[in-house]
Amino acid sequence: INNWNVSRCSYMSYMFDGCCSFNQPLDKWDVRNVKTMGYMFTNCSKFNQPLNEWDVKKCENMELMFAECHNFNQPLNTWDVSNVETMEGMFFDNRSFNQNIS
């Protein structure tokens, strides 16, 4: 699915919610038009793929995006999150995440 053309998508909420075994690369995705990613990887307990190259500057909702992604520990320091309105619980119960997000 890394080669899917998602460039026209604006809503990716719940896309992989509950996919406990999912751990496939998505680094080639063009997400520049996505406005909401809330709950996108919630309960994806094995997911740990790089997403640092994603252009998320149009995203407004990242609520619970990585909640209960117990293995996710990838850098996100290049993300421009200046338009995000809610990050509530973005890393809730994510036991591995230990990246610099400043």
Question: Residue spans of the language-model regions?
Answer:
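Negatively charged
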Residues: 1-102
